[in-house]
Regions:
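Hydrophobic alpha-helical segments
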Residues: 1-158
Length: 158
């Protein structure tokens, strides 16, 4: 049995969540995060949470933001791949720390290193992006939002 879509059954709450997401996206951009950097956070958190809808959406948006397919394919092994810049690695570490609770000693160390690299404003903005995608992952998972088939260019297959 399919559960109700939270976004459809509570449209005012969905509108508020969407407004929060838009505000955080604006804040992230003003703090110096690139669209690719925010997509790294969204894709990695969605992988960890097992959210198919958000993975489908944000993988396409990541490619549109310039992230290579190779880097997307290797995200589960990013720490060993040696392909990612220091900033990209910081985004991925933030995504993992914000998604895997409670914070471990390793996660706390990763966050401290990311903060040192990014500075407080960009670091906090990245954390907000991670918090927000975790919210949307849970909405989509609980709503059982479907993933629709797409062709190689990302267009819906009829």
């Amino acid at each position: 049995m399919t559960r109700p879509y939270l976004d459809k059954t509570s449209p005012d709450v969905w509108k508020a969540a969407s407004a929060l997401s838009a505000s955080i996206a604006d804040h992230a951009a003003s703090a110096g995060l690139t669209p690719a950097e925010t997509e790294y956070i969204k894709v990695r958190a969605s992988q960890l949470n097992g959210c198919p809808f958000c993975l489908d959406l944000h993988s396409r948006e990541a490619r549109a933001a310039g992230i290579t397919q190779q880097k997307l394919d290797l995200l589960p092994a990013w720490r060993d791949a040696e392909l990612y810049t220091d900033r990209e690695a910081a985004m991925l570490a933030i995504a993992e720390a914000a998604t895997r609770m409670p914070l471990s000693e390793n996660s706390a160390a990763d966050l401290a290193a990311a903060r040192g690299l990014l500075g407080d404003e960009a670091f906090a903005a990245a954390e907000w992006v991670a918090v927000t995608i975790n919210l949307f992952n849970r909405i989509s998972i609980l709503s059982e939002h479907p993933v629709r088939p797409r062709d190689a260019e990302g267009k819906l297959v009829k």
